[in-house]
């Protein structure tokens, strides 16, 4: 039974990282594209747009890091074993 739990934990860890990176990846691509469009339309607002973009990218990246933390917990501090 322990081998089944270990195998399921490895699969769940892979899914946690994979699924946790899909949303932020799409969001970061969209945000960067919109920022480039905004800077092209209003070059004088470049500093404000860039600052907002970097802050929002950091928040989006935090979601991926949370998925990584869950995956590491499943692999090394498995609560199911």
Curated annotation (Swiss-Prot):
Gene Ontology cellular component list: chloroplast thylakoid membrane; proton-transporting ATP synthase complex; proton-transporting two-sector ATPase complex, proton-transporting domain
Which residue positions does UniProt flag as site: Reversibly protonated during proton transport?
Answer: 61
- Report the GO molecular function annotations: lipid binding; proton-transporting ATP synthase activity, rotational mechanism
> What is the protein name stated in its UniProt record?
ATP synthase subunit c, chloroplastic
Major subcellular location class:
plastid
- Keyword set includes Plastid: yes
On the tree of life, the source organism's domain of life is: Eukaryota
Pfam family of the protein (one) = ATP-synt_C
Q: What keywords are annotated for this sequence in UniProt?
A: ATP synthesis, CF(0), Chloroplast, Hydrogen ion transport, Ion transport, Lipid-binding, Membrane, Plastid, Thylakoid, Transmembrane, Transmembrane helix, Transport
Q: What does this protein do?
A: F(1)F(0) ATP synthase produces ATP from ADP in the presence of a proton or sodium gradient. F-type ATPases consist of two structural domains, F(1) containing the extramembraneous catalytic core and F(0) containing the membrane proton channel, linked together by a central stalk and a peripheral stalk. During catalysis, ATP synthesis in the catalytic domain of F(1) is coupled via a rotary mechanism of the central stalk subunits to proton translocation.
NCBIfam families the record matches:
ATP_synt_c (TIGR01260), PRK07354.1 (NF005608)
- Does the record's keyword annotation contain 4Fe-4S? no
Cell compartments where the protein resides: Plastid, Chloroplast thylakoid membrane
Q: Which family does it belong to?
A: Belongs to the ATPase C chain family.
């Amino acid at each position: 039974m322990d081998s089944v739990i270990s195998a399921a934990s490895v699969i769940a860890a892979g899914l946690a990282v994979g699924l946790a990176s899909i949303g932020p990846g799409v969001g970061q691509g969209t945000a960067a594209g919109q920022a480039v469009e905004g800077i092209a339309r209003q070059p004088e607002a470049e500093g404000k747009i860039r600052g907002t973009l970097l802050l929002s990218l950091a928040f989006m990246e935090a979601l991926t890091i949370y998925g990584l933390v869950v995956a590491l917990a499943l692999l090394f501090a498995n609560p199911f074993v």
